[in-house]
Regions:
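Short glycine-enriched loop/turn motifs at secondary-structure junctions
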Residues: 106-107, 140-142, 172-174, 207, ...
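Rossmann-like NAD(P) dinucleotide-binding subdomain of oxidoreductase/dehydrogenase enzymes
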Residues: 14-156, 280, 397
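ALDH superfamily catalytic-core signature
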Residues: 120-260, 323, 394-402
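Structural detector of well-ordered beta-strand residues that form the stable sheet scaffold
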Residues: 57, 64, 93, 135-137, ...
Length: 403
């Protein structure tokens, strides 16, 4: 944004279309909204705050930030970084507290809210913003689907499933939570995933591949979803039970097959280190099931035919799609990021994202040398207007030219 922000927010001059093109000039000014309220979650507490913070500040706003009450020092760190970088002290302020503090921020007279968190809380935030008639960006939950095509590079796709599901212990809104694989490659794909998962390590200290579950609330959800899946016929090939050899909340890297859409594991956000693989007839069924979700944050398609991957991705009802990669959209600053359905409202990143922290203020200048008619109406002026309408809209060539 330091490199491209000025270009994104530069004043733009436009010529109107239609009959106005010879009489008016439009100038678009991107004005700061004022004060942005920023509410951020416990997973990725620095990254998920720094991104909207940078965009709001670069657009000329002040920011009041309410971090999660269970990761308060992340915001303190961000504030220190901003002050060391030369940001005026009061331009970015942090308020600590729980949900009541967040609710107070919503009604404190801010000009926009940027919220990242759960669907349930996001609904409350959206309702408050509607009541206060202020815009909001809501980045909510996800249940990202991975579609593995029959021609996919199995080694690469299996690695994508493992990385996408286990990254940050699954505590990632764009983490892969559902994997759909055609029958023709199902067994070798599952074998590859199992082979890659078994050597992964988990430890309370030192180097390890998968860390701890953040807290007891998330552990309860993970265990509930696994219990429900087992009761409905799912097969656990690796892991599947809480790692009680370690003190704390540890759930091992887990691979589950024979899953379906009757299970919470395939319907609700799990937010844990689980690869859940469902067998499908073909890519068409995979796409149908991928779209059979209340969520629509992002997704990914794996194939050696990049054009086919793009075609399938374009049919996924999600905010964004990656081909032969996982969860990359948030890291591509030029690509707008946001969800559809219950995954959110609005977008961050890119030109669209930074302009979302502005009011687009058009100034329209009349470029003619005399008044364009007015009171009192006369038969002559009315006749002139009728002739103009007939001339422009009654002639196909002129209609194409002016309309």
């Amino acid at each position: 944004y330091a490199k491209h922000g000025k270009k994104y927010l530069a004043t733009k001059t436009r010529r109107p279309s239609g009959v106005m093109r010879f009489a008016k000039k439009v100038t678009l000014h991107y004005q700061p909204l004022g004060v942005v309220g920023l509410i951020t979650p416990w997973n990725g507490p620095v990254a998920l705050a720094a991104n909207p913070l940078a965009q709001a500040l670069m657009a000329g706003n002040a920011v009041v930030h309410k971090p999660s009450e269970v990761t308060p020092f992340s915001a303190v760190l961000l504030q220190e970084i901003c002050e060391k970088a030369g940001l005026p002290k009061d331009l970015y302020q942090v308020v600590q507290g729980d949900g009541a503090t967040g609710a107070a921020l919503l009604d404190a007279g801010v000009d926009k809210i940027s919220f990242t968190g759960s669907v349930a809380t996001g609904r409350k935030v959206g309702e408050a913003c509607g009541r206060n008639l202020i815009p909001c960006t809501l980045e909510l939950g996800g249940k990202d689907a991975m579609i593995v095509c029959a021609d996919a590079d199995l080694e690469r796709a299996a690695d994508g499933a493992v990385r996408g599901s286990f990254f940050n212990t699954g505590h990632y809104c764009c983490g892969t939570e559902r994997v759909y694989v055609p029958d023709s490659i199902y067994e070798p794909f599952v074998d590859k995933v199992v082979e890659m998962t078994k050597p992964l390590t988990q430890a309370a200290s030192g180097a390890s591949d998968v860390g701890a579950v953040f807290w007891d609330k998330q552990m309860d959800i993970i265990e509930d979803h696994m219990r429900d899946a087992r009761e409905k016929g799912a097969q656990v090939l690796v892991g599947g039970e809480r790692n009680r050899s370690l003190s704390g909340y540890y759930f091992p890297p887990t691979v589950v097959t024979d899953v379906d859409h009757t299970m919470d594991l395939m319907r609700r956000e799990t937010f844990g280190p689980i690869v859940a693989i469902q067998k499908v007839r073909d890519e068409d069924e995979a796409l149908e099931l991928a779209n059979d979700s209340d969520y629509g944050l992002s997704g990914n398609v794996w194939t050696q035919d990049l054009e086919k991957g793009a075609r399938i991705g374009a049919k996924m009802v999600t905010g964004s799609v990656s081909v032969n990669d996982i969860a990359v959209t948030y890291g591509v600053a030029e690509a707008p990021f946001g969800g559809v359905k219950e995954s959110g409202v609005g977008q961050v990143n890119g030109e669209v994202g930074i302009r979302g922290y502005c009011h687009v203020h058009p100034v329209i200048v009349d470029t003619t040398k005399k008044a364009q008619g007015g009171y009192p109406y006369t038969e002559e002026s009315a006749d002139g207007l009728r002739k103009m309408v007939r001339t422009v809209f009654g002639n196909k060539f002129l209609r194409r030219l002016f309309v």
